[in-house]
A protein has these predicted regions:
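Short proline/glycine-enriched turn/loop motifs at strand-loop junctions of beta-rich domains
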Residues: 98, 150-151, 289, 328-329, ...
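Acidic carboxylate motifs that coordinate Ca2+ or other divalent cations, activating on Asp/Glu
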Residues: 28, 32, 87, 91, ...
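Short, solvent-exposed loop/turn segments at conserved positions within beta-propeller repeat blades
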Residues: 42-47, 96-100, 149-152, 205-210, ...
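Gly/Ser/Thr/Pro-enriched helix-cap/hinge segments flanking short amphipathic alpha-helices
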Residues: 207, 221-365
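Beta-propeller blade termini
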Residues: 17-27, 77-86, 119-120, 128-138, ...
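Blade-edge motifs of beta-propeller repeat domains
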Residues: 1-15, 52-74, 105-126, 157-178, ...
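Proline- and Ser/Thr-rich low-complexity, intrinsically disordered segments
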Residues: 361-520
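Hydrophobic beta-strand segments that make up the repeating blades of beta-propeller
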Residues: 33-37, 92-96, 144-148, 196-200, ...
Length: 520
């Protein structure tokens, strides 16, 4: 690597800092960076926080003052980009230590920000160490958990969905009075609810070991869990990160401790619950898809994730997004809203897989139909997944081409590399055939022309045309003699049925005359 700090536009000053957070605040496809400084105005050469806009050419521009996010000279431990009001623009939360309140900068969408901490209800003053963002109640609005020192305890902020937050630390049972540092959201048991892990250590000069905390989300509240292994050992924990070291779909935890306790990797023993792992790859948006909103729907349940970079205290989570699915066996839909404004939607996904979703994949990798798209019951249709290395259709077929004989939704995973890519599912509908009821009146006499035929289509689609083999057209015929009449009935969906109608007639009447001679 070559150090390009001085030439790429990043300001070269002496400062103290504990975090950088990355986000595309102007949604131009290039990640910008916010540098947090832990300096107050009483320190020599005190610096504010810095926002550097990525110019897309390998250089950055200092837009701190233009954007209005300097935060003054305050003791900032951490900052995080996330969209708290669901307007698609990444906002900025700044967690400040000691006597400095926390700040929430609302993204105005024009390169500037408005500070709304007081109005949003998050401008409290306490020893904010770190902030982690997640949607713990699956309502589609992202909440915050901020760690603190023992005096006031940690803060859980519930997003009310109207631009404000409510402190629910006590009511959610996540309030704890220890020296807390890093915290992460993770669905440790894959039950569809995100749990909470908090790293703890006593503060200098004591540096007493603390017991890390794990709060299991029950769906209605949180309960401290003491049987996970994580919470049975005294640690000197500062930071934690989430990942999946053995790719089993259960999130593992890496904990960074102060010496003499070393770094610890805690492997999740897992279970039988199902899961989905998703990683994003931007094409128009930034490569990692940072700033994307993902919504998973299954059996009427919804889960939401927001992709971030640098949201943890002295750590970074894996870019894999985890969705626990308990005993559900199919995902109804997965929606990715990218920073570019593009939306990918995938339907009817199987569970227990790791997917790399490429921006635009749901429309680029279309399933092609071979032959006519006007299909009726009794016909067949061939679907083409395109040229890839491997295939897995929703039917279980592993061939490129799939022949279908009945209505349904068909999707396929295709792979041209390490991970599978999903195609847009296709709905196939076989139109029902016409159902013809035949009403007849047979000729009343031999060789008479008073026969009658009426065809009544009681099928789903109306009749468009009836053609008889003798050239007549229409559903009603009269003035018919006995015989066999063949027709083709076609409905408005293009489906047809061909049958024949037989009209019988009475036998001819024969008369015989007998003469008897009369003898006189």
């Amino acid at each position: 690597f070559t150090d390009v700090s001085a030439t790429c536009g990043i300001i070269q000053v002496s400062t103290i800092g504990y975090s950088t957070s990355w986000g595309d605040y102007n949604k131009d496809g290039f990640l910008d960076v916010y540098l947090s400084t832990y300096m107050d105005s009483f320190q020599v050469n005190a610096q504010t926080n810095f926002l550097f806009k990525n110019n897309g050419d390998g250089t950055f521009e200092n837009t701190t003052d233009i954007a209005g996010v300097s935060n003054g000279s305050q003791l900032t431990f951490e900052s995080v980009w996330f969209d708290y009001d669901n307007d698609t623009w990444p906002d900025l939360f700044v967690a400040n230590d000691r006597s400095f309140r926390n700040f929430l900068y609302h993204n105005n969408g024009d390169g500037t920000f408005s500070e709304v901490g007081y109005a949003a209800g998050v401008a409290q003053v306490f020893d904010a160490m770190s902030v982690t963002v997640g949607d713990y109640d699956n309502d589609g609005w992202f909440d915050m958990y901020i760690t603190n020192t023992p005096e006031l305890g940690n803060y859980m902020y519930h997003n009310n969905g109207d631009g404000t937050f409510s402190v629910v630390s006590a009511s959610s049972n996540t309030q704890m009075f220890q020296y807390s540092w890093g915290a992460i959201w993770m669905d440790g048991d894959n039950d569809q609810w995100q749990d909470l892990f908090v790293a703890t250590i006593d503060f200098a000069p004591n540096n007493f070991p603390g017991i890390d905390s794990y709060f299991r989300n029950t769906g209605t509240s949180f309960e401290p869990t003491y049987t996970t292994g994580l919470t049975t050992i005294a640690n000197l924990s500062y930071a934690a990160a989430r990942g999946d070291v053995n790719n089993d779909g259960y999130a593992d935890i890496l904990i960074h401790n102060k010496q003499p306790i070393g770094t610890q990797l805690w492997k999740n023993e897992g279970g039988s619950a199902n899961y989905l792992k998703v990683r994003l790859q931007g094409t128009i948006s930034n490569r990692e898809g940072v700033g994307s909103r993902i919504e998973l729907s299954a059996a009427g349940n919804h889960q939401y994730r927001y992709t971030m970079s640098g949201e943890q205290y002295l750590s970074q989570n894996s870019q894999w997004q985890f969705f626990g699915l308990s005993d559900l066996t199919q995902i109804d839909s997965l929606v990715v809203n990218w920073p570019s404004g593009y939306q990918d939607v995938f339907y009817n996904l199987p569970v227990n897989q790791s997917l790399v979703l490429v921006e635009g994949a749901s429309s680029i990798n279309q399933i092609q139909i071979i032959g006519s798209t006007h299909i009726c019951e009794g016909d067949s249709l061939v679907l083409d997944a395109g040229a890839w290395n491997s295939y897995l259709w929703s039917t279980g077929s592993t061939d490129r081409y799939l022949t279908v004989y009945q209505s349904g939704t068909y999707s396929v995973e295709v792979s041209g590399g390490e991970f599978p890519v999903l195609t847009q599912p296709i709905d196939v509908t076989f139109s029902p055939l016409p159902i013809v009821e035949i009403e007849t009146i047979e000729p009343p006499c031999y060789e008479s022309n008073h026969g009658f035929i009426q065809l009544v289509n009681s099928g789903v689609n109306e009749t468009s045309q009836v053609i008889w083999t003798d050239g007549f057209e229409g559903e009603i015929r009269d003035g018919l003699t006995a015989g066999e009449y063949e027709y083709l009935l076609m409905d408005v969906a293009g489906c047809s049925i061909s049958q024949s109608v037989i009209l019988d007639q009475p036998d001819s009447i024969r008369t015989y005359a007998e003469f008897n001679q009369i003898t006189c």
